Regions:
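Extended active-site neighborhood of metal-dependent phosphoesterases/phosphodiesterases
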Residues: 1-35, 41-43, 105
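Active-site-proximal beta-strand elements of phosphoester/diester hydrolases
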Residues: 20-29, 50-54, 108-114
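Short, flexible loop segments at the rims of nucleotide/cofactor-binding pockets, characterized by
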Residues: 26-31, 48-49, 86-90
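Conserved beta-sheet core of the metallophosphoesterase superfamily
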Residues: 56-131, 140
Length: 146
């Protein structure tokens, strides 16, 4: 789309509610060469960073300085069988990064099930979703003096 930057292994600085942060995009782990280091080139070490990527399998490569990684790809496995779990999750890590908010070593990953399907048009006990992620600053905003 015109005027919208594509963040394939690159980052852009943003400001929201007077809080500066970086948004970095990492190419799809399975579909293309991806370079996390290149995606974070130029990002100030002290600035908060949010990484967006298609496939959560890249999460082990994301450095601890990244505040949040957001991904999709797995569709939550599309099928969840009570007592058996998710028999098929398109990930080298199985159910580990299949769905939801995952915290590992103090790092945060959010994986959405999305609204579509892959291979077969079937979902069972894994409803489609459009996620709303609320991000709050750990640093309180200074109040203007009166």
């Amino acid at each position: 789309a015109e005027g919208i930057p594509v963040l394939e292994d690159r980052a852009t600085p943003l400001v929201f509610n007077r809080i500066p942060f970086w948004l970095a995009g990492v190419s799809d782990f399975w579909e293309a060469a991806h370079d996390v280091r290149r995606a974070l080139t130029g990002v100030d070490e002290a600035s908060p960073v949010i990484v967006v990527t298609h496939n959560p399998d890249v999460f082990p490569e994301i450095p601890a300085r990244v505040a949040l990684t957001i991904a999709g790809h797995t569709h939550g496995g599309q099928v969840a069988v009570p007592g058996l779990g998710r028999p098929v999750v398109p990930s080298q890590f199985g159910e580990r990064y299949a769905i939801g908010h995952i915290v590992e070593g103090g790092r945060h990953l959010f994986v959405s099930t999305g609204i579509g399907t892959s291979i077969l048009p079937v979902r069972f006990r894994v409803p489609p979703e459009i996620s709303l992620v609320t991000i709050r600053s750990a640093i309180p905003l200074s109040q203007p003096s009166s």
